[in-house]
């Protein structure tokens, strides 16, 4: 599969996707575990705030037992799908950080207000990608 980017008057970098090796998969799993350790506390704080606000009821006690925190995919735990192909992690490591964001910053120098436009492919649309764009101070349009 091929990936490329361009601007109004510039050709950007491109990339030809190769199958992922077993060693790359092991390294990816280790890095994802490290990322999960970094983001778990902030996600837990956010969950506790949202859950407690949802359970506030001035007239009576909420029904059922109090929800317990579990760090799962539903609450924001990062994981990879088992099917292979291009997922959020490979897209971030091979395209977003080394190729797309530097090109977008270069374009923003000549054209302030530059936006990165992507389709809603699962690798592009993953919630963690927005954090990367925010950290790099690049605007995007999905």
Please tell me what each predicted stretch does.
Residues 1-142:
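Surface/interface recognition patches
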């Amino acid at each position: 599969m091929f990936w490329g980017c361009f601007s109004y008057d510039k050709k950007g970098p491109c990339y030809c996707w190769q199958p992922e090796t077993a060693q790359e998969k092991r390294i990816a799993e280790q890095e994802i575990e490290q990322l999960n350790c970094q983001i778990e506390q902030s996600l837990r704080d956010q969950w506790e705030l949202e859950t407690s606000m949802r359970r506030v009821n001035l007239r009576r006690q909420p029904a059922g037992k109090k929800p317990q925190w579990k760090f799962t995919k539903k609450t924001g735990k990062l994981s990879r799908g088992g099917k292979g192909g291009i997922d959020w992690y490979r897209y971030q490591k091979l395209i977003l950080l080394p190729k797309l964001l530097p090109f977008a910053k270069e374009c923003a120098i000549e054209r302030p207000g530059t936006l990165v436009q992507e389709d809603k492919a699962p690798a592009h649309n993953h919630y963690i990608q927005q954090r990367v764009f925010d950290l790099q101070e690049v605007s995007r349009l999905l």
